[in-house]
């Protein structure tokens, strides 16, 4: 494929910033959702089966079975005025806000549009690239697949491009500070517990990245800060984020609980499961909860439909009294400042 990138006479120009996010379907129409599911689920870092078996499973069973129900869920978060999904709109808003600070900022999605190739083809010659994956924690199904796909596209289209990739920022002071600032105003109302819900991953994904046989519990001594596997252990990184948020908010351990959401299929994922705890909390006299989703920097299907809508319904049907969803960071001014700090390190 021909390289149609523009030329740029200024060889010392500043870095171009590429924001990477996971992506969304083109629309909530069944055909677009089916196309997105096929692209997403046939990624070997999502479903780790051999190629042919993975293709048969996804295209022959999963997508035909799930496309209509998934499309119905996507319709609940579709914005007709912008003809876009929140994840796309918020990511583009982040890019615009960062651009106002004097940076050249572009957006690409791992699945869907705009693609990494779209950005690379328009990248001016003589510019270097800084890739900022909008995933605070390392997981093979989010950070790793986005970064490795981006690297592969760079090798294919721009083999001489100078670039760097920002590491997961799960413990970065600026990220923790803005998360705490986002949550703090909600603590003024009476509550029984702050829930921090992270996107779950299959246990075998964790085993593949850490190369350890892990128990259902996070084993003592696994992935300490000094352990070299900590930089790829999703479970360690999420618990570290939780601990730092709790400390920043000056909350006691019993006031904060971490859970994992979005499990699909019948394999074992990281526990505890949000879906189970939602029904259990009211029985434990935890009837007023605040819930935030730190693994999502932008509101999306999983935060809005799964947690804020469906999660609230489950909680209240089980006897819960007050369910308060705390929106993601999205494109707030403090988050933009935090991203500037993360980019500059």
From Swiss-Prot:
Gene3D superfamilies (UniProt xref): 3.40.50.1400
Subcellular location: Cytoplasm
Alphabetical list of Pfam families matching this protein: Ferrochelatase (PF00762)
CC per GO annotation: cytoplasm
Residue ranges the record marks as coiled coil: none
CDD domains named in the record: Ferrochelatase_C, Ferrochelatase_N
Keywords: Cytoplasm, Heme biosynthesis, Iron, Lyase, Metal-binding, Porphyrin biosynthesis
Protein's pathway: Porphyrin-containing compound metabolism; protoheme biosynthesis; protoheme from protoporphyrin-IX: step 1/1
GO biological process, one term: heme biosynthetic process
UniProt EC number: 4.98.1.1
Keyword Cytoplasm included in the entry's annotation: yes
GO molecular function, one term: metal ion binding
Reactions catalysed according to its record: heme b + 2 H(+) = protoporphyrin IX + Fe(2+)
Domain of life: Bacteria
Binding site for Fe cation: 199, 302
Matching InterPro entries: Ferrochelatase, Ferrochelatase_C, Ferrochelatase_N
Main localization, broad class: cytoplasm
Entry's family note: Belongs to the ferrochelatase family.
Job description of the protein: Catalyzes the ferrous insertion into protoporphyrin IX.
Name of the protein this chain belongs to: Ferrochelatase
Source organism (scientific name): Porphyromonas gingivalis (strain ATCC 33277 / DSM 20709 / CIP 103683 / JCM 12257 / NCTC 11834 / 2561)
Name of encoding gene: hemH
């Amino acid at each position: 494929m021909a390289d149609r990138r523009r030329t740029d006479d200024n060889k010392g120009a500043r870095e171009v910033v590429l924001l990477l996010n996971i992506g969304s379907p083109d629309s909530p129409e069944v055909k677009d959702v089916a196309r997105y599911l096929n692209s997403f689920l046939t990624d070997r870092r999502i479903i780790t089966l051999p190629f042919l078996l993975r293709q048969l499973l996804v295209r022959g069973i999963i997508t035909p079975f799930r496309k209509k129900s998934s499309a119905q869920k996507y319709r609940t978060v579709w914005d007709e005025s912008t003809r876009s999904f929140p994840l796309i709109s918020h990511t583009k808003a982040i890019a615009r806000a960062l651009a106002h600070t004097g940076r050249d900022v572009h957006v690409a999605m791992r699945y869907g549009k705009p693609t990494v190739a779209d950005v690379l083809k328009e990248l001016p010659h003589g510019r270097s690239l800084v890739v900022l994956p909008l995933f605070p924690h390392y997981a093979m199904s989010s950070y790793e697949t986005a970064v490795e796909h981006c690297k592969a596209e760079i090798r294919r289209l721009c083999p001489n491009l100078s670039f760097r990739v920002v590491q997961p920022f799960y413990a970065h002071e600026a990220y923790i500070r803005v998360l705490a600032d986002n949550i703090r105003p909600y603590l003024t109302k009476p509550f029984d517990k702050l829930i921090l819900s992270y996107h779950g991953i299959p246990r075998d994904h964790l085993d593949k990245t850490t190369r350890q046989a892990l128990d259902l519990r996070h084993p003592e001594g696994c992935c300490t800060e000094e352990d070299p596997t900590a930089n790829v252990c999703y479970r360690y990184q999420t618990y570290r984020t939780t601990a730092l948020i709790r400390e920043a908010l000056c909350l006691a351990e019993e006031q904060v609980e971490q859970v994992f959401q979005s499990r699909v299929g019948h394999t074992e994922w990281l526990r505890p499961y949000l879906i189970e705890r939602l029904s259990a909390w009211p029985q434990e006299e935890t009837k007023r909860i605040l819930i935030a989703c730190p693994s999502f920097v932008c509101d999306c299907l999983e935060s809005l439909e799964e947690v804020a809508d469906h999660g609230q319904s489950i909680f209240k049907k089980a006897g819960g009294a007050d369910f308060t969803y705390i929106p993601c960071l999205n494109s707030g001014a403090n988050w933009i400042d935090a991203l500037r700090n993360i980019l500059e390190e």
